């Protein structure tokens, strides 16, 4: 900003002490300070919010940003006579944009919200760091769980204990990670088979078992697939699954192999496989790089071999194991997890069939015990004579009856009734009693609501006295009929010019005195306005849809006090929202219910106290205003800062020329002194 030179002595006047930072020319400061020194005198919190420390922190965190400055200058000079006193006002506005394409800093999301800048400044002053508030999309795409069995990459990582028990919970993750198997045979000659019913894999030792890996979205570059065996039962889960000493020390399956002899799981046909043993927990796993599926396929196939039988002594020793397959990043963060049980045996088809038959028999026996609850038939042998079991005569409730039905609609209705009656037999008695009590309460509530509607219509037809107009039949205002989110959008600070003419509420028919009294419970109000909210605050909680006195007292547990209100013509909560404790006492409400109703009225008032915050902050002198915004475009960090500066310069002539302009201050002082003496 250039200043014109004057032969007159210059005295700079600042209307606000906070503006004094802007009086010196930018040459007196560094480039950063000259553009980021700001002041706000609205409140202590506001001044701290835009303090130089905050801008310095933003500048440091942006490292080397790309800045663009758009200066706007306005000058006003009041010079009535030549070489006389002048009054010059200069207004400057700098629109500064800082942007950076680096999004690796986790603190960046804090600068994308205007309200969070204040909390950041407080955290800086307190010497503490705050966590970044991630939104839903960011959490789904970026937040990943750390690997519980990742190798430590530094001394610090090695000092932190790894979990001794890896998680076996299925987790599809952000990429919908899934593991499946091909169509398998149950023949005895099959080398492997998978039971979807038991979620269990049966395979022979050292035989190839293909596993299909599927993701909906491609994982990040360098992702790997890890396979790790763990014991299934809780008493064995802390032990590491390894091969038995017999197979580990044998030459069979070990000669010419890259995999260590103690590893149970091996990968076949992949030279990039890496066998890992955690130095802390000792758990063994195998890693292969993730490869996208080939053209025309949905899956990525990995060939695994299991190098020890489940029945080997010294190894698994007939203890069931689980295979945990995870999709991880190169630094060990888990992107997805799948788990299935495995059994390595000599005849997979036979063992699968035996296990499935055993499970089915167990399910049938359990259902029989839960169904009739009868004991086993009684058999008795005496003197060599075998007594046959006497079958119970089937009770009428166990008979199967058939009812011919005509029409699909009638059949489906009867089918629902049949299923409901059968399901009711499996419910405990206390659940049924609770359901019946709830139905009775709802029935009583409906009856009270109907009576209140009738009384409301009767009071609406008669005209109340003039002295009771403020307390009787007070209809809700238009702002109360509009839902709270739209009410925030219709505030004077956010409604654009000319918006009132386009509001549908003004053009539609609003139910007034007669319409509101005749409004039935099933009749809906006009549809809500679909107006975008310009407030950046969280919208208030929704108001209760039923604003009648009946529902209000029912929520407070004071339904017995309904008559005190209906006798005075009070049917909606809007008629009592401004009541005080004395007003409730005048209604002769018992004292034990009076405090509860008063608290409910206060809670109802708080729902109406939400308003959109001002978008323009001003200082008391109006001299300096700073607004900060932020935006993110195409993965870049952008911070917009606008600085307003007001400078007023008053120029006076030299002291020896003051007499020409009636600026003789000594004569003025003498005159005031003489007036003071005469007054005394």
Swiss-Prot record:
Q: Does the keyword Repeat apply?
A: no
Pinpoint the Glycyl lysine isopeptide (Lys-Gly) (interchain with G-Cter in SUMO) cross-link.
Answer: 676
Which cofactors, if any, are listed as required?
A: Zn(2+)
Q: Per the record's keyword annotation, is Transcription regulation included, yes or no?
A: yes
Which Cys pairs are S-S linked? none
Q: Which residues bind DNA?
A: 170-362
Its biological purpose: Acts as a sequence specific DNA binding transcriptional activator or repressor. The isoforms contain a varying set of transactivation and auto-regulating transactivation inhibiting domains thus showing an isoform specific activity. May be required in conjunction with TP73/p73 for initiation of p53/TP53 dependent apoptosis in response to genotoxic insults and the presence of activated oncogenes. Involved in Notch signaling by probably inducing JAG1 and JAG2. Activates transcription of the p21 promoter. Activates RIPK4 transcription. Plays a role in the regulation of epithelial morphogenesis.
Name recorded for this polypeptide: Tumor protein 63
Originating organism: Mus musculus (Mouse)
Encoding gene per record: Tp63
């Amino acid at each position: 900003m250039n200043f014109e030179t004057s032969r007159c002595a210059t005295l700079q006047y600042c209307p606000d002490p906070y503006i004094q930072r802007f009086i010196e020319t930018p040459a007196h400061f560094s480039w950063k300070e000259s553009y980021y020194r700001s002041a706000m005198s609205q409140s202590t919190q506001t001044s701290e919010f835009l303090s130089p420390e905050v801008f310095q922190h933003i500048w440091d965190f942006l490292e080397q940003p790309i800045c663009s400055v758009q200066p706007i200058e306005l000058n006003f000079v009041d010079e009535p006579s030549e070489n006389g006193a002048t009054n010059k006002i200069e207004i400057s506005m700098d629109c500064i944009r800082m942007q950076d394409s680096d999004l690796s800093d986790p603190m960046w999301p804090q600068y994308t919200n205007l309200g969070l800048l204040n909390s950041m400044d407080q955290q800086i002053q307190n010497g503490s760091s705050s966590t970044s508030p991630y939104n839903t999309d960011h959490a789904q795409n970026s937040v990943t769980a750390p690997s519980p069995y990742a190798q430590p990459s530094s001394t610090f990582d090695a000092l932190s204990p790894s979990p001794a028990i890896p998680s076996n919970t299925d987790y599809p993750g952000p990429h919908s990670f899934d593991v499946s198997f091909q169509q398998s045979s149950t023949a005895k000659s099959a080398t492997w088979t998978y039971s979807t019913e038991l979620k269990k894999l049966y395979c022979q030792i050292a035989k190839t078992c293909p596993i299909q890996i599927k993701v909906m979205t491609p994982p990040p570059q360098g992702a790997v697939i890890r396979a790790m065996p763990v014991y299934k039962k809780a008493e064995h889960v802390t032990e590491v699954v390894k091969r038995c000493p017999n197979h580990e020390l044998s030459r069979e399956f070990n000669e010419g192999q890259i995999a260590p002899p103690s590893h149970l799981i091996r990968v076949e046909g992949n030279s990039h496989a890496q066998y890992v043993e955690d130095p802390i927990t000792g758990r063994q796993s195998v890693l292969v790089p993730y490869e996208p599926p080939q053209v025309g396929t949905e899956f990525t196939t990995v060939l695994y071999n299991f190098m020890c039988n489940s029945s080997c002594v010294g190894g698994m020793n007939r203890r069931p194991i689980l295979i945990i397959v995870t999709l991880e990043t190169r630094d060990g963060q888990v992107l997805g997890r799948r788990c299935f049980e495995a059994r390595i045996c000599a005849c997979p088809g036979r063992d699968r069939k035996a296990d499935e038959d055993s499970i089915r028999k167990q399910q049938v026996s359990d259902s029989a015990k839960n169904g009739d609850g009868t004991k086993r038939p009684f058999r008795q042998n005496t003197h060599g004579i075998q007594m046959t079991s006497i079958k119970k005569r089937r009770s009428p409730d166990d008979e199967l009856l058939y009812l011919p039905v005509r029409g699909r609609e009638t059949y489906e209705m009867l089918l629902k009734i049949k299923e409901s009656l059968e399901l009711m037999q499996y419910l405990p008695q206390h659940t049924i009693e609770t359901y019946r009590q709830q139905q009775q309460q709802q029935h009583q509530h409906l009856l009270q609501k109907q009576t209140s509607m009738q009384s409301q219509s009767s009071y609406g037809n008669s005209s109340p006295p003039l002295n009771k107009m403020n307390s009787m039949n007070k209809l809700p205002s238009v702002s109360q009929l509009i839902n709270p989110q739209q009410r925030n959008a219709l505030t004077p600070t956010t409604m654009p010019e000319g918006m009132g003419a386009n509001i549908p509420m003004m053009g539609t028919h609003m139910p007034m005195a007669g319409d509101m009294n005749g409004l039935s419970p099933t009749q809906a109000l006009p549809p809500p306005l679909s107006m975008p909210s310009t407030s950046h605050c969280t919208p208030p909680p929704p108001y209760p849809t039923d604003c009648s006195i009946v529902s209000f007292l029912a929520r407070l547990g004071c339904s017995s006090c309904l008559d005190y209100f209906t006798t005075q013509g009070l049917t909606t909560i809007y008629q009592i929202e401004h009541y005080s404790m004395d007003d409730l006492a005048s209604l002769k409400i018992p004292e034990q219910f009076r405090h509860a109703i008063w608290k409910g009225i206060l809670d109802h008032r708080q729902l109406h106290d939400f308003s959109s915050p001002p978008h323009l902050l001003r200082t008391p002198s109006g001299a300096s205003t700073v607004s900060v915004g932020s935006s993110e475009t195409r993965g870049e960090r952008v911070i917009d800062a606008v600085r307003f500066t007001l400078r007023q310069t008053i120029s006076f002539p030299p002291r020896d020329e003051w007499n020409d302009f009636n600026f003789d201050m000594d004569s003025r002082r003498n005159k005031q002194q003489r007036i003071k003496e005469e007054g005394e």
